[in-house]
């Protein structure tokens, strides 16, 4: 089973994340941030990755530290669960509609972290959640999962829909990229013979 648990504790947050890449999309997200929990639920459901997140953070300051640190821990858990990445599909893309919004997500599970994020939010907040934190989460996740990730909202008018299409798009792209390729016979999908450098 491709599973991992990451525990991360700082003066700002105390986080435990568990993932099962070969799960059923079961989510148990408890960050204290309702909208963020909703996004993590979507990520689990549409990636078919079981995700458990327990986070206690300095929410009295703002949601930044908790959101970013969950991205760090979740990225580390995915990377650890992937092991040497033998047999995975590696590349995937998804065009994700959400009503009037359309977002393109392209991923390379390469061990080389990079993020291109192009999404503009009409509003500064979704409820109490700062929309700028969507990019912060994707940055933290990509850097720590070791993935190259391109996220581009082609058009959209509703901030909630834009955020949701980004997370759902990542979910479906990630689901495809980490899937085991039955034709690869356990080979690492790289002419170098390894991923990560």
From Swiss-Prot:
It comes from the Bacteria. Its EC number is 4.2.1.19. It catalyses: D-erythro-1-(imidazol-4-yl)glycerol 3-phosphate = 3-(imidazol-4-yl)-2-oxopropyl phosphate + H2O. Pfam families: IGPD. Its main location: cytoplasm. HAMAP family: HisB. This is Imidazoleglycerol-phosphate dehydratase. It comes from Rhodopseudomonas palustris (strain HaA2). The gene is hisB.
